[in-house]
């Protein structure tokens, strides 16, 4: 299928970068962007090495580690695992629990005490951004192992220190962090089928395509464009990171990170606008 260039197509990367920076400059906050054309290798980078609180973008590295350990035979993706709501703080080992009303997926809390397949928890962790599922999976795979895998992949600035809602760790400034560059790196590897193997990479992509939160990268894109992505948000912070698939088979990686947002809603709109600029530039090539 051929895609006709948009009337809004931007002719060159220098002009595109200027327009993106102008869009970001309308907002009070700090933004980062990493774009990679997976056909040509072209990259467009803005604040790509600046550290951000990862929010729920840390769940993609956790997903990767789960598939890596499953491939190594530590468990299978279909193994049953206990749904629990009791976790240890990384500060002192004390127990803490999550509140259903603070989670973007409250349904899993009705399953506490039962067992579900590992896959079901991975799926909820990504598409619903379930914090409870995330903490259960982190207990299964180990945060240190996630970091080790990130280093092996070359992502030196992704830090997954802990699960979600560890308030003692938060108070001590022990947070999960990321950069746009490292997110671009891991999604590039996934898109190329190089995380574990093509089958595992494709399985992760199929989960990410089902993402329920679509207010940033996909928001202004045509409906036949598929996006395999993971969002993240806490007050003043909004992220989206993933792979954009055009119906003609072409694809690109796009990472959008933000922090210190005074107006979250306006920041999200700016990111959706920038995603459309990138799309218009890409199809105009």
Where are the language model's segments positioned?
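Active-site SXXK
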Residues: 41, 53-86, 254
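Acidic helix-start/capping segments at beta-turn-to-alpha-helix junctions
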Residues: 77-99, 141-142
